[in-house]
Amino acid sequence: MAIPYRRPQSTPEDGCAAYLDVIAGQGGVLLGALLLLDGRGRPLEFVHNRTEPPGGWMWPDELQFQACIAAVAHSLFDACRREPDLVVCKCTLGPRDYLRVEVGPSIPMVVVWPAADGAIQWDWVNDPPTHGMRSHSLAPELKTRGFLVEPFHRIVRGLQILYPTDLTKDETDDPVP
């Protein structure tokens, strides 16, 4: 016989945020990860991938990096089993226009970076969530609980464990934006 209990009301914790990061490793290798957390910071899924940039004299360095970021992001999106309500990324992945056009998630995406005073700033890459979307209340909840930057530390730790020969300490000294 089941024990009856009172179910909590729907809260922002019911939503899911996906933290996207791509880190340059040794020899030009790029390592990417997507960490999905609920509004309380509990991990739900971790998806990772690794790629080498296209080579040759026809590929300028900046185009190589941008092509790889989009390719890694898309492969992570395809491999993800859950459907997050929000994507959070660091400003190091590229300008907002690039992220909106080339990475192009159809769900709200926010980019984060540190301000001069140490506070974390954020800006919407595409349209911010509207009232009624779970991400509308999830995004402020993540900020209040301190989960705009901390998950990127988890991503780096995960990538270091999974790809120990591809990452050195120098490449992961400052894993936050």
Model-derived features with residue positions:
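N-terminal accessory regions of nucleic-acid-interacting proteins
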Residues: 1-4
